């Protein structure tokens, strides 16, 4: 509707609909302004305790919007303090294209006593994080093994070994390689060396978590929960063999 408004191409009903949306946004902005005045990162301690009581430890937190370029220092500090209150060792965001922002995030992370782990998709390669790592000890990695393979990289184990002390968490999924079409596949059916990567972590006693990220199409005769059980079993079998 806003694009059509710029072209002066709105019907009478669309003008009314857009006016209603503007009113809703103004109301939401007012509520958000009031919330910002009273927000407290310590409120996240209650959420952490709820998860801990259920046997779940929160190791990472992705307040993606609040970490993006253009946000105020206050918003970024709040996001990092919330992550720390949750018990996370790091907050995550896609590695910014603008290196001045990763520099800023690194400085604020150091101030808040937490790390910023930079995620990637098919932009990833072994040198992709170099600038951010040089900028601050608080800048670390949150790579994605499946996307790394889909990007056409063939140095997976070299990459993991090189950055083992800088990887704070890693997503695992099974994707086809760039040459084979990059599709997301059930575990064990793609080109991603999940089994070998997990065994490398085990044998070298790397302590960072590997997180299953479910992205392949759920078969018609199955459910996401059933498929996740298969993913977990695949990983357990890899570690037991």
Regions found by a protein language model. Name each.
Residues 33-37, 43-50, 54-140, 149-151:
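Active-site acidic/histidine proton-transfer and metal-coordination neighborhood
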Residues 3-6, 10-23, 29-32, 36, ...:
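Histidine-acidic metal/acid-base catalytic patches
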């Amino acid at each position: 509707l806003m694009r059509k408004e710029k072209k002066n191409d709105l019907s009478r009903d669309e003008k009314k609909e857009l006016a209603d949306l503007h009113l809703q946004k103004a109301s939401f902005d007012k509520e958000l302004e009031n919330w910002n005045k009273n927000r407290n990162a310590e409120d996240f301690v209650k959420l952490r305790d709820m998860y801990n009581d259920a046997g779940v430890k929160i190791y990472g937190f992705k307040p993606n919007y609040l970490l993006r370029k253009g946000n105020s220092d206050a918003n970024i500090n709040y996001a990092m303090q919330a992550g720390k209150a949750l018990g996370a060792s790091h907050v995550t965001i896609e590695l910014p294209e603008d290196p001045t922002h990763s520099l800023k995030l690194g400085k604020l992370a150091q101030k808040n006593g937490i790390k910023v782990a930079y995620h990637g998709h098919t932009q990833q390669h072994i040198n992709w994080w170099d600038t951010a790592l040089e900028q601050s000890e608080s800048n670390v990695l949150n790579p994605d093994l499946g996307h790394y393979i889909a990007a056409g990289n063939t140095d997976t184990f070299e990459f993991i070994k090189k950055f083992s002390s800088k990887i704070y968490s890693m997503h695992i999924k099974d994707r086809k390689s760039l040459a084979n079409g990059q599709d997301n596949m059930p575990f064990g059916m793609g080109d991603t060396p999940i089994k070998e990567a997990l065994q490398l972590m085990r044998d070298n006693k790397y302590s960072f978590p590997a997180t299953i990220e479910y992205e392949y199409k759920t078969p018609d005769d199955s459910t996401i929960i059933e498929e996740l059980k298969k993913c977990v079993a695949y990983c357990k079998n890899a570690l037991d063999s």
